[in-house]
Regions:
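Short, contiguous, well-structured surface segments enriched in hydrophobic/aromatic residues
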Residues: 1-115, 134-135, 170-172, 182-193
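Polyanionic, low-complexity intrinsically disordered segments
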Residues: 87, 97-122, 132-238
Length: 238
């Protein structure tokens, strides 16, 4: 019964992860396009410079010119000379993460902490491929992200820093919290942000604890649930 219940909870959590990560991706792109406009950066030149540094993307772009969803958009331009808004629209999320890091370094942009982007990509990919995200919660062999620790310390004033570091050594937990922080930091639309945060709060307060008696013997699951729930509740909707 516990495994069946947990798999259902995991499915609902994956749904939220996919929805939230899409919202974060959209907001990251909107924010970076705004910065490019404000800095008066040439919209074609920035793409050509990136492609020159990472020419592997040329093949990806060329392959996408024949896909139903973006071929009309890409067909308006001579390959591989695309304006930045088109480039960001058609590249996969993993490539966008790389571009975002490149842009932050080259143009001194500090819109969002780049060290969390790989965590977000990892949990987004896991959810999209229907991999379990509530997984191996006793494994704390990973490395915690110092920036993420500093953010969580501010959210959990009554929890020792060492405890926070210990919890974030679990890769699945660290990735989830990274996405939650991104929702708070990146999404500028208050309606969209509030919707994302309210959805995850309702999941933690509702479906996750509907059959809580099934998990009385799982100390690690209870600890991680309480840890994540406190963060979810302290990242308050505006």
């Amino acid at each position: 019964m516990a495994l069946k219940d947990l798999s259902t909870i995991d499915m609902y959590l994956r749904r939220w992860i996919i929805s939230a990560s899409l919202s974060v991706e959209h907001s990251l792109k909107v924010n970076i396009l705004k910065d490019i406009q404000e800095k008066n950066i040439d919209e074609f030149n920035i793409v050509s410079e990136y492609i020159a540094k990472y020419p592997r993307i040329i093949t990806e772009l060329d392959n996408r010119r024949s896909t139903a969803y973006v071929k009309t958009l890409l067909g308006k331009y001579n390959h591989p000379n695309y304006p930045i808004y088109v480039f960001l629209e058609v590249i996969p999320f993993g490539e966008f993460v790389n571009f975002y890091k490149y842009y932050c370094a080259k143009y001194e942009y500090d819109g969002f902490n780049c060290t969390l982007l790989d965590n977000i990509r990892n949990i987004r990919n896991a959810a999209a491929h229907s991999n379990c995200v509530i997984h191996d919660l006793t494994n704390k062999a990973g490395f915690y992200n110092n920036y993420l620790v500093s953010r969580v310390v501010k959210l959990l004033a009554g929890v020792k820093k060492r405890t926070i570091q210990d919890r974030l050594k679990n890769k699945c937990v660290q990735d989830f919290i990274s996405l939650l922080i991104a929702v708070d930091d990146v999404i500028k639309s208050e309606d969209l942000k509030n919707h994302c945060l309210q959805e995850i709060k309702e999941l933690f307060d509702g479906r996750m604890v509907r059959n809580k008696d099934l998990y009385k013997s799982s100390t690690s699951l209870q600890q991680m649930y309480i840890f994540c729930k406190e963060i979810v509740h302290n990242v308050q909707p505006s």
